[in-house]
Amino acid sequence: MINFKQFLEEERKNPKSKTLHAFDMDEVLFHHDHSKVKVHVKDQHGKKVQSLTNQEYNSHKLPHGHSYDYSEFRSSKVFKKSATPIHKMIHKLKAIHKNNKNVEIVTARSDMDDKHGFMKTLKHHGIDPHEVHVRRAGNTGAASPAEAKHKVIGDLVKKHGYKRVHLYDDSKDNLEKFKSLKHDHPDVEFHAHHVEYHPETGHVKLTTTKA
């Protein structure tokens, strides 16, 4: 027997479709003022030694004995202040969802400190979190964002039997790791869409590769 949360999750899906579209959140659906939100690196004494933007964090290698401070990335208030919608990508998400309900947001973030405040901000920008599930890959405890998303999407493929999976992400590392799922699922098509957003012009460039 499934619980109520699982029931709501299944209601979002189209069981007839074997295609999943997964969207990264930061720098794909929302651009951020990097002066307002960063991941901080602390040394073994708890002293802040470095601050990373979302894009820098994606490829950062944590030195031995150091740790990450995600407090700004877990703050719903900071998200509301720093996030600017990338309208072309949000429109794309909504258009795909209209025809195929199997659309999810897969973010490297973990749980936000104010779930309802975060959901309210998403809805304000046209994304209904009751319709589009937000997978928080940061909760997996994986060593990197790429490995975390690899695990989350791999689990979804196993659970729902998807035959075509699309990932829209601004990190090439994340996309390369995503395509490596082909080794475990040779009968599945993996479409990696690299998203480059230029805030000065509002231009979005998509580059697609396939595994």
At which residue positions do the language-model features occur?
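Proteolytic processing junctions in secreted/extracellular precursors
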Residues: 2-11, 207
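Alpha-helical substrate-recognition element adjacent to the catalytic core
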Residues: 15-143
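Residue-level recognition of the N-termini of beta-strands and the immediately preceding loop/turn
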Residues: 19, 101, 131-132, 163-165, ...
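Conserved Lys-Pro-Asp/Glu-containing loop-to-beta segment of HAD-superfamily phosphomonoesterases
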Residues: 19, 149-172, 178
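Short, surface-exposed basic-aromatic patches at helix termini and helix-loop junctions that form
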Residues: 98, 119-128, 155-159, 179-188
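Short, surface-exposed amphipathic charged segments that create phosphate/polyanion-binding patches used
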Residues: 142-157, 204-211
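Asp-based, Mg2+/Mn2+-dependent phosphohydrolase catalytic module
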Residues: 164-166, 172-211
